[in-house]
UniProtKB/Swiss-Prot annotation:
Keywords: Ribonucleoprotein, Ribosomal protein, RNA-binding, rRNA-binding. It holds the Pfam family Ribosomal_L21p. Belongs to the bacterial ribosomal protein bL21 family. The gene is rplU. This is Large ribosomal subunit protein bL21. PANTHER family: 50S RIBOSOMAL PROTEIN L21, LARGE RIBOSOMAL SUBUNIT PROTEIN BL21M. GO terms for cellular component: cytoplasm; ribonucleoprotein complex; ribosome. Part of the 50S ribosomal subunit. Contacts protein L20. PROSITE patterns: RIBOSOMAL_L21. The keyword NAD does not apply. This protein binds to 23S rRNA in the presence of protein L20. GO terms for biological process: translation. InterPro entries: bL21-like, bL21-like_sf, Ribosomal_bL21, Ribosomal_bL21_CS.
């Protein structure tokens, strides 16, 4: 059984017992979170597609940890002008473990 959920403006295909990194959620480590924006639920050949969401479907997850991704370096460079600007960015994430899919 799997589902497609929306979190942080992105769509994720999830299965029960799977861990994934989402955009940062304001939930403490060890807490639980429910995703009610479920776009698709599939159980074998039984597939429910929402328009836009599946009514009554929800995915529950447990927050495992918070952290930051690897650094992304941004460089702006003007050729022949002796001008270069460097900037780095590390995006926050929340790692969750999917505990249940209903729907």
């Amino acid at each position: 059984m799997y589902a497609v959920i929306v979190s942080g403006g992105k769509q994720h295909r999830v299965k029960e017992g799977e861990t994934l990194k989402l955009e940062k959620l304001e939930v403490e480590t060890g807490g639980s979170v429910e995703f009610d924006r479920v776009l698709l639920v599939a159980n074998g050949d039984d597939v429910k597609v929402g328009a836009p969401v599946v009514e009554g479907a929800k995915v529950t997850a447990e927050v495992v940890s918070h952290g930051r991704h690897d650094k992304v370096n941004i460089i702006k460079f003007r050729r022949r002008k002796h001008h270069m600007k460097r900037q780095g960015h590390r995006q926050w994430f929340t790692e969750v473990k999917i505990t249940g899919i209903q729907g």
